[in-house]
């Protein structure tokens, strides 16, 4: 009996170590929309000034991985670990294989340029660590990823890919 407990503890420890070593943890689901990656650290010195700041350099890419279904982002919510959130309030359709960059700062949303601005001159993603969540209009988690700067960003450029 003791031998089984020791073996179970060793297996559990090995599993936890493997999970801790994974660069960006993903909560996989059957949803077509996935978080493709995050530019969590905007290039340059962080500044939240609306006209001269660099909040537009911070973005989250959402991609439609479906082979055939078009998805409307209206009602989807993006949030971080602290609960700061952005809700897509307008129609924004993603064709199969298409993506959108949800950028910080203010700008003009464009289906043609695949960009939606949060309309806020603050940063959403923490530079040291955070978790990005994408939830459906009904409140179910479509995708989520946790990252740490030291464990997930091997080249130190402030961008972490989640899905190819």
Across the structure, where does each feature detected by a protein language model lie?
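Solvent-exposed coil/turn segments that connect beta secondary-structure elements
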Residues: 65-67, 81-83, 105-107, 137
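Short beta-strand and strand-turn-strand segments in soluble, beta-rich domains
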Residues: 78-90
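Short conserved beta-strand and strand-loop elements enriched in small hydrophobics
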Residues: 76-79, 132-134
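Solvent-exposed beta-edge/loop recognition patches
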Residues: 27-35, 45-47, 90-164
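Bacterial N-terminal signal peptides
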Residues: 10-18
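A structural motif detector for short, solvent-exposed N-terminal "entry" segments of globular domains
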Residues: 2-10, 22-74, 123-126, 150-152, ...
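Compositionally biased, intrinsically disordered/low-complexity regions enriched for serine, proline
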Residues: 20-23, 158
